[in-house]
Amino acid sequence: MNELFQTPQVEAGIKEYPLMPLRDIVIFPTMVQPLFVGRRFSIRAIEEANKKDKLIFLVLQKDKDVEEPKEEDIYKVGVVAYILRTVPIEDARVKVLVQGLKRGVIKKLEWKEDHYVAQVDVIEERDIPPESQTIEDKALIKAVKESIDKLVSLGKQIIPDLVVLIKELEEPGKLADMVASILDIKSSQAQEILETFDPRERLKKVYKFLQDEIGLLEVKQRISEIARERMEKEQREYYLRQQLKAIQEELGEAGGIKAEIEEYTKKFEEVKECMPEEGVKEVEKNIKRLERLHPESAEAGVIRTWLDWVLDLPWCTRTEDNYDLERAREILDRDHYDLEKVKDRIIEYLAIRKLTQGKEAPTQILAFVGPPGVGKTSLGRSIAEALGRKFVRIALGGIRDEAEIRGHRRTYVGAMPGRIIQAIKQAGTKNPVIMLDEIDKLAISFQGDPAAALLEVLDPEQNKKFTDLYIGIPFDLSEVIFICTGNRADTIPTPLLDRMELIMLSGYSEEEKLFIAKKHLIPKLIPLHGFSPEEIEFTDEAILEIIRGYTREAGVRNLQRQISAVLRKIAVKKLQGEKGPFNITPELVRKLLGVPRYRPEREKKPLVGVATGLAWTEVGGEIMFIEATKMKGKGSLVLTGSLGDIMKESAQAALSYIRSKAEDYGIDPDIFSQVDVHVHVPEGAVPKDGPSAGVAIATALLSLFTDIPVRMDVAMTGEITLRGRVLPVGGLKEKILAAKRAEIYEVILPAKNKDEVMEELPEYVREKMTLHFVDNLEEVFKIALVREPKPLKEA
């Protein structure tokens, strides 16, 4: 090969060269080979070689997966090579073309700055010229050349010029190196040839590997012939299967399907006693069918998948419940603040389970409904931990196909079990805690109603024999504790809601958020951002600044995000050299987080035709302004602000009440036919509905027609009748907290809600609020208007 490229002569003796480890290829003397180089130290070795005489020492790694090999990770014997060409390619890699020159042995290896340098003892190889060869040598050389012809005839792809070159070589050492470079052998075997300095022995090893490769090619050819004879008129797919079968016969692996059947049978015996009778028959039938089918057929694949699912289900496996009530209370108190009703309900459940051990306890499905971020999902995890059970969460938001719940029939391509059975398999026990998250956001489509499919799952009378369409065998779900979560109860289908025990979770007050931030969020977030507890201290005022100025939510999810934002910015300051400890004050919060996003929403001065109402949405309580104005017209009522039908009817009822009492409030009755009234609720892009704005609409309309301003430091809620009665509404705790957030400390509420408010509202919130409980609109107007309207005769 030296005739093809101009390469320098390398003298024997100790020389120093840059060293490049190779992952899985061995370069032999005279061998020309392209290499793709990506490791930085290898690229530097090439650069150093190119600066000098383009000579580099190439040596094989013992383990190709080692990224930064040390001295013990590489072999001692390698090849001094000449770099013929270097071409940079993408991704900062280079492609080099090298030619092996002479063998060498590493005497000393050093790391110089950023690459290896080796002291190499270059070997002066003494080959055996034709005149010095024995008859055995010549016979071996001839046998090797004939074997090359045999390889080519068996389909081995070798460059024709290389075959000619091999035929011309008469020295055993050079012939061995040339043939070794084209053999399909492991890198460790190639290294063994490289380390054989004796040319005779080297050629013998090459001949052995050559015969092994010829043997493999002959077997491959024989397998092809056997398969071709059996193929007849079948398609290519059948031909490939026959080849595989012939390979299995040649290797003695035809018993693979038998081992598979034995494994399925063993698994079946382990769960057989816990399966229903129809399930036992179905599994036995499918195992027998699998035995008769061709292992590569499509039907066999379907049966295998089904058996894998069925036999991996925890038919017999269950966890033991932990009935320690004190431990359960500790876990619930540790992970969640307040939520006493929920905690008491869990303790009650545990108490019943403990008292009915060995008997069938009544199954209860709990449903946690409340705004985002109040701890519904995490509460499920705590319940599972308190009970000592596995926990699995199923996200139901946006699911519109009942097959997601009940599974697909096996006849469909790509069929799978539904999410319930998948959750059971994931848990690995038949009595986990399964959380059905966002159950209020299930959708209906032409593919069916997933809410209807859940009826069987959540009904204690039916779920003992829940049948997934894919599995086709009844599975007992009666031991599973199902916990559902949602933001609104009114969007959960009534039949589904009827199967649940509804537990309402309200939003947190400012004081509760402060406590949660100090006791839970901040201690958890400080180490997550790389600080020790001693380095960071939040003042109460700083936390309140974040709560009031940068969050507007019922839960604490956004509060956690804002605290994280503060800690991230403090982390940057620390890395820039600022010394701790860091004391987080309101001023620092404003500096780090910028201008507060939320300001108190209430108007300061009393306004005519504007009242402050209270709304309850799925994200918590909010205040909303009801604006009313009039213009010349014919007595029509215009309503805007993306209002629902119920809210429009409330506005109509409020106007009718004002008209019926016009003279009592000093209003000329004729004016109603001479003007149009327009009622608007700002934030028109947000849909609004419900009867609870009736009180606020009536107040705004009375203010409009009497020109008496409405107090802006008073908020109100309540449904009204045409007689002026104030009826009870829901979500009062959230509404009162919304008023408090907006710095409105006086609230008008229906009298029939008084007991509920007094029970649910924390005392520290009640102390700061002035709550007016009213029965009719007369009482509302006395409180909400800056002065009482006078009857028409008096006016």
UniProtKB/Swiss-Prot annotation:
One of its GO terms (cellular component) is cytoplasm. It is found in: Cytoplasm. It catalyses: Hydrolysis of proteins in presence of ATP. Induction: By heat shock. Keywords: ATP-binding, Cytoplasm, Hydrolase, Nucleotide-binding, Protease, Serine protease, Stress response. One of its GO terms (biological process) is cellular response to heat. The active site is at S692, K735. One of its GO terms (molecular function) is sequence-specific DNA binding. It is an enzyme of class 3 (hydrolase). ATP binds at G370, P371, P372, G373, V374, G375, K376, T377. Residues 605-787 form the Lon proteolytic domain. InterPro entries: AAA+_ATPase, ATPase_AAA_core, Lon_bac, Lon_bac/euk-typ, Lon_lid, Lon_proteolytic, Lon_Prtase, Lon_prtase_N. Residues 17-214 form the Lon N-terminal domain. Its EC number is 3.4.21.53. Pfam families: AAA, Lon_C, Lon_lid, LON_substr_bdg. ATP-dependent serine protease that mediates the selective degradation of mutant and abnormal proteins as well as certain short-lived regulatory proteins. Required for cellular homeostasis and for survival from DNA damage and developmental changes induced by stress. Degrades polypeptides processively to yield small peptide fragments that are 5 to 10 amino acids long. Binds to DNA in a double-stranded, site-specific manner. NCBIfam families: lon (TIGR00763). Homohexamer. Organized in a ring with a central cavity. Belongs to the peptidase S16 family. This is Lon protease. It comes from Aquifex aeolicus (strain VF5). The lineage of its organism: Bacteria, Pseudomonadati, Aquificota, Aquificia, Aquificales. The gene is lon.
